[in-house]
């Protein structure tokens, strides 16, 4: 990786170029023809080859035909809904479960406002936001694992 020279704004030639509209894109390697003719086609062909390879090497599995009159004992949602499914399953009152599920997006919306006075980007210099993130991640993983377990072995919140 090469270091780029910072422009000298007191240079009259550079000021003349900036006045003509040649801004920060003037420095470095131009996009035409380098990126558009060489890099983009390689990325597009590589992505297409990966998709075709995945489609050929791992085709979609066709299972047994669906029977609308036979319902499985436990119906599980998709994997990304396991934590909120476990919240619903572990709380006895369904209204309380729905309110707890609604608190998940509200909590995610409030995360940026927890420590907005701290302008540092380093996580070690933002202990409150880092702690909230780590605790939230651990609770989400714990709830997701609990939802994947059978109903009789399911995790509880320790309250009921």
Swiss-Prot record:
Pfam families: Cytochrom_B_C
Record-annotated membrane-spanning stretches: 36-56, 95-115, 131-151
GO CC terms of this entry: plasma membrane-derived thylakoid membrane
Superkingdom of origin: Bacteria
Protein's membrane topology: Multi-pass membrane protein
GO annotation terms (biological process): photosynthetic electron transport chain
Alphabetized UniProt keyword annotations: Electron transport, Membrane, Photosynthesis, Thylakoid, Transmembrane, Transmembrane helix, Transport
Subcellular location: Cellular thylakoid membrane
PANTHER family noted in UniProt: CYTOCHROME B
Subunit structure: The 4 large subunits of the cytochrome b6-f complex are cytochrome b6, subunit IV (17 kDa polypeptide, PetD), cytochrome f and the Rieske protein, while the 4 small subunits are PetG, PetL, PetM and PetN. The complex functions as a dimer.
Role noted for this protein: Component of the cytochrome b6-f complex, which mediates electron transfer between photosystem II (PSII) and photosystem I (PSI), cyclic electron flow around PSI, and state transitions.
Protein's UniProt name: Cytochrome b6-f complex subunit 4
Organism: Nostoc punctiforme (strain ATCC 29133 / PCC 73102)
Gene from which this protein is expressed: petD
